[in-house]
A protein has these predicted regions:
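Long, positively charged amphipathic alpha-helical accessory segments at protein N-termini or as interdomain linkers
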Residues: 1-3, 7-8, 116-148, 158-221
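N-terminal lobe of the biotin/lipoate ligase/transferase fold
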Residues: 2-140
Length: 221
């Protein structure tokens, strides 16, 4: 078990007559890592809207995974799909969203809301507010006074540079929603951007100078 944990990135030291002590936790986004931070110790139930986490080392798109699961497996409301990297990440209007491994949070939340389709657009705004608050919470805890704001309706900017984009997709009939998928891409520890976007895009690392543990942000969502 100790060797397996070390392979996963944990730094473990042996303490004489006491066993082992974990001195450094890896920046991983596995289902277990995220759920451990979402579960209430007293009740054993999850807090917030996320009920289950499905993790992939790599996928084409977490939005696609969520939609496939919703249609094929009747996946439950509150299921979060998250991956280390996407090969076909996308933003609004079909724009490509670069999603390299180990640098960001690429996730999609599946919802089955009991609301009219005409009101579904508000879910994007609610998601933007939740992401903004999660980023602000983590940065504040780490002593950063960065200016994190929502650029309505679906972008999060830090010091006036885009660090997060949100893509919402829906399957519905005229008066009934089958499901909504809210995809979120957060540039956390990204160190460089393509010349075509580096004037307007950034990451939490570039704006603060600190590498942040990604699972903390997911758990704060």
């Amino acid at each position: 078990v100790i060797n397996q944990l070390k392979e996963e990135g944990y730094v473990i030291e042996a303490v004489q007559n006491k066993g082992y002590h974990i001195t450094k936790y890896p920046d991983i986004l596995t289902s277990g890592e995220i759920m451990s931070q979402l579960t209430c110790v007293d009740t054993g139930s999850t807090t917030g809207i996320i009920r289950e986490v499905v993790y992939y080392d790599e996928t084409d798109s977490t939005n696609n995974e969520a939609k496939r699961a919703a249609e094929r497996d009747n996946a439950a409301d509150g299921t979060l799909y998250i991956t280390e990297s996407q090969t076909g990440g996308r933003g609004r209007r079909g724009r490509n969203w670069v999603s390299p491994a180990g640098s960001g949070i690429w996730m999609s939340l599946l919802l089955r809301p009991d609301i009219a389709p005409v009101n579904a657009s508000m879910l994007t705004i609610v998601a933007a507010m939740a992401v903004q608050e999660a980023i602000h919470k983590v940065l504040t805890e780490d002593g950063h006074d960065a200016e994190c704001r929502i650029k309505w309706p679906n972008d999060i900017v830090l010091n006036k540079k885009k660090v997060c984009g949100i893509l919402t997709e829906m399957s519905a009939e005229m008066d009934y929603i089958h499901y909504v998928v809210i995809g979120m891409g957060i540039n956390v520890n990204t160190t460089e951007f393509d010349d075509s976007i580096k004037a307007t895009a950034s990451s939490l690392y570039l704006e603060t100078g600190d590498h942040l543990k990604r699972s903390r942000i997911v758990a704060a969502f």
